[in-house]
């Protein structure tokens, strides 16, 4: 199904009964066609934090939790965010014998939509801690030039030719939902091993997404592919933690080497 057929940007009724068929899968293949040869495009995870989870226990008493969904990057489909919100709303008045029964139902439904095994972890509402970013923040640097749309020619190696392993981050990632045009804000982490990149050029490249229309997952994959092709690292990780919208935040991560998979985190802006 095409994204134009989704409920994004459309007025909808919020369901009050269990409706797994509201979930809307979007095929990853089309946006990945030009990156098919890139190592790591299908390696990684999409982590979602769901802050508006509620269901009824066996006695009909409302339960609440924060959820972390883990969706493999190798899945044929991602799940459109508004449909996921509506799906979780449809569970608000549904009774389950146990918390485990609730988890198993959600995992079954999301796995069917994604075409791969999806996992749900629940946290008590006070237990999902806020982390501080690790690495070098590049936001105070001065880019040599600025562009209004993603431009891979901005990416340059440092003149020193030094071999390094480093983790950088920027809070300045901004892109737009390709359907509604609403801005998406995030922090992007880049772990890099190879010839030292020019940090100013990386910042300029990240800033160039500010008027780009793309889903979170697609933006991270484009960033990963452009760095991989233009800077040719030995190893690479790109991980973006986007801010919340509609009770959900999306956190895609792609790695060239599975040993570089980070643990999922939640930042202050989320």
UniProtKB/Swiss-Prot annotation:
It is an enzyme of class 1 (oxidoreductase). Pathway: tRNA modification; tRNA-queuosine biosynthesis. GO terms for cellular component: cytoplasm. The keyword Cytoplasm applies. The keyword Oxidoreductase applies. SUPFAM superfamilies: Tetrahydrobiopterin biosynthesis enzymes-like. It catalyses: 7-aminomethyl-7-carbaguanine + 2 NADP(+) = 7-cyano-7-deazaguanine + 2 NADPH + 3 H(+). The active site is at residues 177, 184. Its EC number is 1.7.1.13. InterPro entries: GTP-CH-I_C/QueF, NADPH_dep_7-cyano-7-deazaG_red, QueF, QueF_N, QueF_type2. Pfam families: QueF, QueF_N. NADPH binds at residues 81-82, 245-246. Keywords: Cytoplasm, NADP, Oxidoreductase, Queuosine biosynthesis. One of its GO terms (biological process) is queuosine biosynthetic process. It is found in: Cytoplasm. Substrate binds at residues 79-81, 216-217. Catalyzes the NADPH-dependent reduction of 7-cyano-7-deazaguanine (preQ0) to 7-aminomethyl-7-deazaguanine (preQ1). Belongs to the GTP cyclohydrolase I family. QueF type 2 subfamily. Homodimer. This is NADPH-dependent 7-cyano-7-deazaguanine reductase. The gene is queF.
């Amino acid at each position: 199904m095409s994204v134009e057929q989704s409920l994004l940007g459309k007025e909808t009724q919020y369901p009050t009964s269990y409706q797994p068929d509201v979930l809307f899968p979007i095929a990853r293949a089309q946006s990945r066609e030009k990156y098919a040869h890139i190592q790591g495009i299908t390696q990684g995870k999409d982590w979602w934090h769901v802050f508006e989870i509620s269901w009824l226990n066996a006695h009909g008493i409302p339960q609440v939790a924060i959820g972390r969904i883990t969706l493999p990057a190798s899945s044929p489909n991602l799940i459109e965010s508004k449909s996921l919100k509506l799906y979780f709303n449809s569970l608000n008045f549904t009774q389950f014998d146990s918390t485990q029964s609730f988890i198993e139902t959600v995992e079954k439904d999301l796995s069917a939509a994604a075409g791969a095994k999806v996992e749900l972890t629940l946290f008590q509402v006070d237990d999902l801690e806020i982390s501080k970013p690790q690495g070098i923040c590049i936001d105070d640097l001065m880019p040599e030039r600025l562009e209004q749309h993603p431009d891979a020619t901005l990416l340059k190696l440092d003149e020193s030719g030094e071999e390094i392993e480093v983790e950088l981050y920027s809070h300045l990632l901004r892109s737009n939902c390709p359907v509604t045009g609403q801005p998406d804000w995030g922090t992007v982490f880049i772990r890099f091993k190879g010839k030292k990149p020019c940090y100013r050029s990386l910042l300029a490249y990240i800033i160039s997404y500010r008027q780009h229309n793309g889903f979170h997952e697609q933006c991270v994959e484009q960033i990963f592919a452009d760095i991989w092709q233009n800077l040719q690292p030995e190893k690479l990780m790109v991980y973006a933690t986007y801010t919340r919208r509609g009770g959900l935040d999306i956190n895609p991560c792609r790695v060239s080497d599975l040993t570089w998979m980070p643990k999922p985190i939640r930042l202050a802006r989320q």
